Every structure is written in C-alpha cells, then in structure tokens.
C-alpha cells in the first residue's frame, strides 16, 4: 500500500464529508488524510481526498471551476436553504420557462453575496453551522463568487433543475436562494450533486478513482533536471541560469518537487521530495 494517495470519491447523500473521510481512511488503511472542499451532508458527488504527504498538494491543485447539478424547490422555506430544515411549503403559481432562463443568464459574472448561515465558515473559532443549529444569531461577512456558466436543464413546477460552474467560495444553496428571490418567492435546494472540482471527477458507479496529482497541478514541468537529483533531494540551493522565472514541477525517478525560479536563477522549494504512487512514475 502506498504512503500517499490522491483520490476522487463519490460521497453519497445524507452523509457528512467527515464521515465519508472516515470510511475512506478505513478503506485504504491510512490515518493521515483530508479533503479538498466540503460537501453539504444532503449533497452527493465528488469529494477529493488526499492521503499522507499528498495533503500538502491541496493549495496547488487546479480545483476550479467547480461544477454542480442542482434542483431548486420553489415555494419551500428552510434556514439551511436545503431540505434538511424545511419550515414551510407554499403553493405558488407556475412561471414561464423563459423568465427562469433569463434570471439564470443574468447571474453570470462575479459578485458579492452573504454565504448561508449553515456553512463551514468560522465565527470566532466556531463553525457557522454549529451556531446556526444552536439558534445563535450572527452575521457572516460578504464574500465573492464567480458564476462562469449556468444552464437550465429542466423546469417541472415547482422544481428548477440547473447546472452551474463556479469559483471557489461559491455556495450553490445561495445561488438557489438568489434565483427564488428574483422570482419573488422562497426556495431551497432539494438536491445537489458536485460533478467535478477542476478536472477531478468520479462517477456514482465508479465510486473511487485514484488520481495522478501531476495531471492536476497547473505548473509546467522543467525538463533535463536529472543532474540536480541529489541536490534537490537534499533541499540544497541551486542556480538555474537562463531559466524563465515562475513555478515549475521537477520530476525525478523516485520523487517530484514544486519549485519557484526567480529572475536571478535562484530557486525556492515550494514543496520538495513528494513521493510517487508507483503507478504514476514517469507518466507525465
């Protein structure tokens, strides 16, 4: 068994991300692990998990756009903006599909919004969702999100089924709330599925896919570096003359590193001596 892994797992609905992580730790027999982006308990879909030293790659992985499919239930009200805390259901008249399509199209772009109270945001060191469950009153700071694309898949009143690709920091539950408010009603998400984080994905039938991290790092690979293998393994200073400044991946026989080259040819180790999963040696 490898000491490090990067996997895309398909989280079932009504299971917390932490509970899913615990199952995966047991499945792979590894104790050190973390996930890239939290999925709401009621949601299903892609949960990217790193084991061992691969958790160090999280800040560097290409994880946007994030793609989701969601169903908005018009007329339903919930403090959590999903079906877990339904407070009331109102029967509302049907809308023209073209009006819904116009609203969805108007959301494309970047804007500030207030994230939902039932979220993983921190308030004085505590998770917002814990405070919300206790009935505590608090205000979350506005954050920014970008909607790159949003498409109406179907409208069967009172359910609006749509697909959306977004930036980090976006809550699809809030997108559902915004759509409902523009229609003049309450609304909650009755289903939510994360399709992908960047290019990292897995299907419901596949369940678990082992990923090659080299395919999901946004940096170019620096070639002809084998003569520096021992020096870089030991983390020694080296100078790379005539190299363009920037961040690079350097691959050796038994490990790879992420470095930054400066204009004077000096380098900084961003991440050094990251081991391969045997299957992925020399695949990039």
From Swiss-Prot:
The keyword tRNA processing applies. Keywords: Isomerase, tRNA processing. One of its GO terms (biological process) is tRNA pseudouridine synthesis. GO terms for molecular function: RNA binding; tRNA pseudouridine(55) synthase activity. The active site is at residue 40. Its EC number is 5.4.99.25. This is tRNA pseudouridine synthase B. It comes from Helicobacter hepaticus (strain ATCC 51449 / 3B1). The gene is truB.
